[in-house]
Design a protein with these regions (language model features):
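Bacterial N-terminal signal peptides
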Residues: 3-15
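Hydrophobic small-molecule pocket/channel-lining residues, especially in calycin-type beta-barrels
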Residues: 19-165
């Protein structure tokens, strides 16, 4: 009986230590959940989820967008995956999509209800993905800065989204 009690205490102590090292995801936690993009379905439909995975050690965003056929252009689907993680004290993210892109981001939360993902400096264009809390929903934007103007981000996509019920 004592050995069973000892095993239980060791397990409990290990579980408490694991819980203590799970990131709080402060500033990002409001994104966790299932979201549906709002807008004109004739332009496309989509949605995304943010979820804790690997015991809460990472956040994973899964995103999709379905675009209808337009003229000679066939319908298409865009899928992407982003893993958000801690690297020392820094929050980082890696993004992959169905078009073959891979983007490394630094992540910041400059204000409550605001998250910015800014791509690492590289020889090519830089990217900025932003989320802003708007009451129960959010506004999102994706911006691109050309190689010769590294901080001059221009809008590429913008959207609003609501939590799925």
């Amino acid at each position: 009986m004592r050995s069973l009690l000892l095993v239980f205490c060791l397990w409990l102590g290990g579980s408490a230590a694991a819980l203590a090292t799970t990131p709080a995801w402060t500033g990002l936690d409001w994104l966790i959940g299932d979201w549906t993009a709002n807008g004109d379905p004739s332009q496309g439909t989509g949605g995304f989820t943010f979820a804790r995975e690997a015991g809460g050690q990472i956040l994973v965003r899964r995103n999709f967008a379905d675009y209808p056929a337009q003229g000679a252009k066939p319908a298409e689907r865009h899928d992407d995956l982003m893993v958000i993680y801690l690297e020392g004290p820094q929050t980082r993210a890696i993004y992959w999509d169905s078009e073959g892109h891979q983007i490394h981001y630094g992540v910041s939360t400059p204000a409550a209800g605001r998250v910015d993902f800014v791509s690492d400096d590289s020889a090519g264009p830089r990217y900025r993905l932003r989320y802003r809390k708007t009451g129960p929903g959010l506004q999102g934007s994706f911006e691109v800065a050309p190689p010769n103007a590294r901080e001059t981000f221009q809008p590429y996509l913008s959207w609003t989204a609501a939590r799925r019920q």
